[in-house]
Amino acid sequence: MDSIWKKRKQQLQDFRRYLNKDNKVKKQEVPDGLYQACPNCNSTIRTLDLKNHLQVCPQCGHHLFIDAYARLDALFDHGKYKEYYTSMKSGNPLGFPGYEEKLEKYEYKTGLHDGVVVAGGRIDHMRTIVVVMDHRFMMASMGSVAGEKITHAIEMATRKKLPLIVFTSSGGARMQEGIFSLMQMGKTCAALKRHLDAGLLYISYLTHPTTGGVTASFAMLGDINIAEPEALVGFAGPRVIESTMKTKLPVGFQRAEFLEDHGFVDMIVKREKMRDTLALLLRMHA
């Protein structure tokens, strides 16, 4: 009897300790990169959901940045393609202070040697050469390597009698390379003229942001110019223009919709329709 009483007493003490215990749920840290905030509507979105929607916000439709390889995976049949000119790396032709260290930093950070990726594959069974500018690497500014890779891609498309698609996204010419950067404008345009003379299709696909010397050269020379929604496309930035001209710019100035209204862009295509639209255009011009 005494042992039963002691056992009962122990159980009551254990129960009281449990009641007095701090039962508050401890705050858990959310792993980095699990969620992202949409810069347009501030919705919190799972990173995996963004990836499945090609980096387009499922709440408001805002187009976030998508890297070159994710775009190529979504564009080519079964995500299969061959990448070209992977060994090209920028030098420092003008001996610009700190430039080599900056290049090394971006190579380590992105895994890229420059901000241009060239690939060949099939879109709806049609062979196509595709160039994608990836602004993770120094805003995909156009230096000698970027211009050389784009020129090589154009010349390969001309030689193989293939259509060419270029996805632009750039801060313009690379100041660290001076005149070597600026000459890429003429070089790429000359290569495009030879592609045009061969009777081949060139589609320029403008993404956010496309500015500077890229806009002033190959970006606006497409047989068909397509843009993603709300992409900024221009030469100088809006703030530079306003401060220089001492005037207020129209609402939406330099955005894709403004350019379409004024005849500089042929169509605006949402990213989810990118592959189907390009496949249709390639089929029409085959």
Features from the language model and the residues they span:
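Cleft-lining beta-strand/loop regions that shape enzyme active-site pockets
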Residues: V117-L196, I203
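Long, charge-rich boundary regions
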Residues: I66-A140
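Short cysteine-rich clusters marking metal-coordination/redox-active sites
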Residues: C38-C41, C57-C60
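Cys/His-rich microdomains that often coordinate metals
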Residues: T44-I45, H63-L64
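Conserved catalytic cores of soluble enzyme domains
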Residues: G171-A286
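N-terminal alpha-helical interaction blocks
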Residues: M1-K26
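Residues immediately within or flanking Cys/His clusters that coordinate Zn2+
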Residues: Y35, L54
